[in-house]
């Protein structure tokens, strides 16, 4: 089993020429490769895409076999992938998914990092995160709009909708956390982001998600103070350990206007640098004594959360951004760790009740112009949404593409299928240079059960019920998605989440149009169903408005 190969540089084919037997297999091939593009993946030599050790394939041998199999796969066959390893090809039918993926799933009693890491070391499992192992990661852009929407809502709730002259304090500039600086600036606030790995700060500078790198805390705070005084939002990255820097800021009596965190706290071995440790010691100890790393990291996270609680008590709006750091701190003895809320119940759930979530698409042509053309089509089809238009304008100006050109755009039930059909028609008419794929994050309205994140504090207490993502995956399979995935542990770590993903290809055919209409209606509708079942009035109203047939819910 080979997991480290620095000589591998993966880039997807681009343009209209096929390297597989059809676009339904070419698309997953290109998106798998795109996940490992050097401008996309956090550590491509080890197949790590983002989120600690979220991989695209179990090992390089498995990657090669997946590629070989996709190149020969027929239009009536389906490839099964088990934790990043291709395990079977079966005869199905033309409207069935071409790939079905299951990653990191464990029987609940054994769903712990300890058991998973043992399997991982034996080469029997792979952590798929959310979009790493499901081949629809589009770089940091994938989370930018969700982060932007969260910050805008924080500004609306706490500062009258105006974040000018305000600043956000956070930590973590990995694949997900790296969206925070740009999202904050787009929302009108400055941002100070602490990151322990200099390479991540360098990557965010290179890809345009970060404006400045500060060498000291004094320098960072000086830049922030000046930007707030001038009401010119900027983002600053500071090399440091959050559990050490946050208390230092507290000691100075400096208070941010908003506080959150996106360190990889979900993985206490691979994701969080213990207090006082060097990166070199951390890397060595992960190999030699992972139990000691975990113990030290958990204690450090407890101190981190205690500092966040102190900021909250000083009046700073504080929110958990879904990395499970509160749970780790509570387990370590911080009894009031959950005194500040998660971002979904605090700011995002009303969108989920409407089936609105992180709709995304990528241009298989590799041509940015295809994305700009689809941006214009979105505006044409949804003309009366100035907030959405503003987002698309900002994205076009500020977001640099990583790997295949792509776009993230939060839309919901009633709009997703219309956009998909329009994109498919654009391919059919030759307005786009090649097909596009449409997918989403697993963080969506009906596709995840995560009691410390997406389903925290559900109205009916159904936070931990994971039937919903299973039903979502089954429904998308039956509806004809091109590939469907079912994962465990994404975002918050082993034992704390189950979630499903789907991707569908717009290749310009009538058959694709039929699949698109089914999938892109049913997928967000399942989210409205899930929230209606939990008793949310918004979801119940949307379900009636859209004519959803929910016999056990609407009566």
Curated annotation (Swiss-Prot):
In this protein, the active site sits at 409
GO annotation terms (biological process): L-histidine catabolic process to glutamate and formamide; L-histidine catabolic process to glutamate and formate
Main EC class the enzyme belongs to: lyase
Can you state which reaction this protein catalyses? 4-imidazolone-5-propanoate = trans-urocanate + H2O
Give Gene Ontology CC terms. cytoplasm
What are the record keywords, sorted? Answer: Cytoplasm, Histidine metabolism, Lyase, NAD
Q: What does the Swiss-Prot or TrEMBL cofactor note state? A: Binds 1 NAD(+) per subunit.
Q: In what pathway does it function? A: Amino-acid degradation; L-histidine degradation into L-glutamate; N-formimidoyl-L-glutamate from L-histidine: step 2/3
* Record-linked Pfam families: Urocanase (PF01175), Urocanase_C (PF17392), Urocanase_N (PF17391)
Localisation per UniProt entry = Cytoplasm
Supply the InterPro entries for this chain: Urocanase, Urocanase-like, Urocanase_C, Urocanase_central_sf, Urocanase_CS, Urocanase_N, Urocanase_Rossmann-like, Urocanase_sf
Q: Which cofactor does it need?
A: NAD(+)
**Residues at which NAD(+) binds:** 51-52, 129, 175-177, 195, 200, 241-242, 262-266, 272-273, 321, 491
GO molecular function term, any single one:
urocanate hydratase activity
What EC number is given for this enzyme?
4.2.1.49
Functional summary from the UniProt entry:
Catalyzes the conversion of urocanate to 4-imidazolone-5-propionate.
What the record says about family reads: Belongs to the urocanase family.
The record ties this protein, via NCBIfam families, to: hutU (TIGR01228), PRK05414.1 (NF003820)
Name the record gives this protein: Urocanate hydratase
Organism lineage = Bacteria, Pseudomonadati, Pseudomonadota, Alphaproteobacteria, Caulobacterales
């Amino acid at each position: 089993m080979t997991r480290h190969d620095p000589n591998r540089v993966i880039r997807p084919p681009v343009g209209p020429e096929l390297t597989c037997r059809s676009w339904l297999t070419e698309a997953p091939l290109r998106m798998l490769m795109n996940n490992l593009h050097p401008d996309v993946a956090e550590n491509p030599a080890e197949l790590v895409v983002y989120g600690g050790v979220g991989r695209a394939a179990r090992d390089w041998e498995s990657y090669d076999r997946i590629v070989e199999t996709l190149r020969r796969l027929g239009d009536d066959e389906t490839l099964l992938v088990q934790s990043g390893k291709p395990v079977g090809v079966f005869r199905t039918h033309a409207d069935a998914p071409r790939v079905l993926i299951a990653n990191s799933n464990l029987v609940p009693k054994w769903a712990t990092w300890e058991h998973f890491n043992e399997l991982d070391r034996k080469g029997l499992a792979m952590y798929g995160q959310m979009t790493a192992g499901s081949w629809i990661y589009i770089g940091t852009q994938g989370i930018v709009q969700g982060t932007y929407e969260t910050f805008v809502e924080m500004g609306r709730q706490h500062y009258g909708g105006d974040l000018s002259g305000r600043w956000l304090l956070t930590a973590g500039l990995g694949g997900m956390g790296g969206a925070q600086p740009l999202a904050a600036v787009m929302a009108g606030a400055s941002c100070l982001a602490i990151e322990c790995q200099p390479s991540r700060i360098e990557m965010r500078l290179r890809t345009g998600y970060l404006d400045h790198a500060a060498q000291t805390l004094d320098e960072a705070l000086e830049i922030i103070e000046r930007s707030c005084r001038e009401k010119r939002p900027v983002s600053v990255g500071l090399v440091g350990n959050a559990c050490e820097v946050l208390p230092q800021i507290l000691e100075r009596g400096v208070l941010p206007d908003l506080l959150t965190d996106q360190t990889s706290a979900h993985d206490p071995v691979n994701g969080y640098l213990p207090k006082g440790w060097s990166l070199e010691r951390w890397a060595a100890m992960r190999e030699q004594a992972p139990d000691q790393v975990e113990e030290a990291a958990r204690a450090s996270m407890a101190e981190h959360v205690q500092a966040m609680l102190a900021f909250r008590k000083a009046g700073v709006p504080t929110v958990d951004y879904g990395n499970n750091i509160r749970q780790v701190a509570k387990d370590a003895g911080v009894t009031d760790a959950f005194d500040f809320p998660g971002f979904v119940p605090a700011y995002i759930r009303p969108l989920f009740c409407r089936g609105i979530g992180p709709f995304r698409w990528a241009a298989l042509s590799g041509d940015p112009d295809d994305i700009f053309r689809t941006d214009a089509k979105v505006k044409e089809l949804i003309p009366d949404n100035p907030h959405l238009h503003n987002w698309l304008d900002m994205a076009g100006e500020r977001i640099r593409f990583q790997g295949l050109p792509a776009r993230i755009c939060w839309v919901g039930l009633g709009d997703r299928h219309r956009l998909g059909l329009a994109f498919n028609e654009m391919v059919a008419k030759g307005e786009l240079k090649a097909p596009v794929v449409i997918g989403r994050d697993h963080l969506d309205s009906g596709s995840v059960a995560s009691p410390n994140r997406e389903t925290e504090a559900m109205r009916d207490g159904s936070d931990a019920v994971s039937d919903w993502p299973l039903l979502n995956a089954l429904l998308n399979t039956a509806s004809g998605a091109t590939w469907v995935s079912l994962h465990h542990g994404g975002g918050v770590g082993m034992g704390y989440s189950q979630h499903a993903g789907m991707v569908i290809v717009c290749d310009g055919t009538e058959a694709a149009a039929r699949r698109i209409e089914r999938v892109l209606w049913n997928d967000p509708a399942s989210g409205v169903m899930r929230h209606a079942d939990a008793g949310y009035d918004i979801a119940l109203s949307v379900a009636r408005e859209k004519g959803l047939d929910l016999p056990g819910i609407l009566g």
